[in-house]
Amino acid sequence: MKKTMFTVASVAILGLMLLTGCGKMADSNKVEAFPTKAEKDTVKVSDCNQFEDFFTPAFQLVWNDFTDKIVGKKVEFIGGNPKIADEFNKQRLTDKMLSEKDYYKTVAPQTVKTKKTIEKELKKKFKEKSQLLDRISWLKKDDGVHKILYCMFKKNVYFPKVFDKLPPAPFITQNTSKTYYEMFGVIKNQSKFSHQVVPVYYNGNDDYAVKLLTKSDDEIILLTTTSEEPVLEIWDKLYSDKLSKNEHLTFDKNSKLLVPFINFKKEINYNELTGKPLANSNTVIDTALEVIEFSLDNTGAKIKNEAMMGVRTTALRPHEPQRYYYFNKPFVLFIRSKNGSVPYFALKVKDPKYLQKG
């Protein structure tokens, strides 16, 4: 007799990673949230970290442009890279892996004109307003020094059939509280959703995964795990061991599905990337911000992700000592014909006796 499959989304490679098909890892101690007003019914998350607990596309695309269009090579900081910089440098996700209809990005002078252009394009493409553009000052004219790198990614995916709303239930952990959370899924009429729910594997009550198919080509994949590994490593293992083989089970009358509603917002200030000299460029990052909003319910998933980087070019590469070729001390002077092997004049200046007084 088949075991009942009672699927609970107890952990996550959630839609933040799954809508784009990749994952990332992060420096858990350095990412800090900056103040904002959380929207109604949205949980403002402060204890999850980029690259450890979630993956998002916008800042990666900004970083890619910073690497390719500003620095011209892999980003390296003097004194070594923060862990998060090394992860961004891997460029696991590029714009070629995404549909152009899902994102807008630009690299431009940090001017009022650029700000207005971005606002116009966001309204035209996504009917959205930026939450980041007002966080920095904008120049009236291009000074040739300050540039802005910006990206917004927005995507909504919908289930072919709306899942049933189920009675609220607790979220099971080692310290399960008495709080109940909104749930959706399938408890009966399994045949109605058999083409929408694709079990990837089922190895017992605490080890299973499912794919939730959408109207588009996107898949929302949920698996149970208590692993402390970064989300990227969890994804790589899942893809290598299961998804790449395209094997699956059947969602039948003995199967049940239970998934929590998710609604959160995260704002990040990448302080560990700002104000630090680069070893291979005369550019300094002044601002590095990101906003992530994600929701999952019985109709589908929505992700809105915005990132912005402000950079400036310094007169000299900050890592190079200034070179003072000052001959106001003992020196020798030679004059020769071009490429001559012997100078036709030479003078040793040991003291100021040959110098002209000012």
Language model features: what each stretch is:
Residues 23-358:
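Hydrophobic-core positions in well-structured secondary-structure elements of globular domains
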Residues 1-9:
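Bacterial N-terminal signal peptides that target proteins for export
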Residues 10-17:
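Bacterial N-terminal signal peptides
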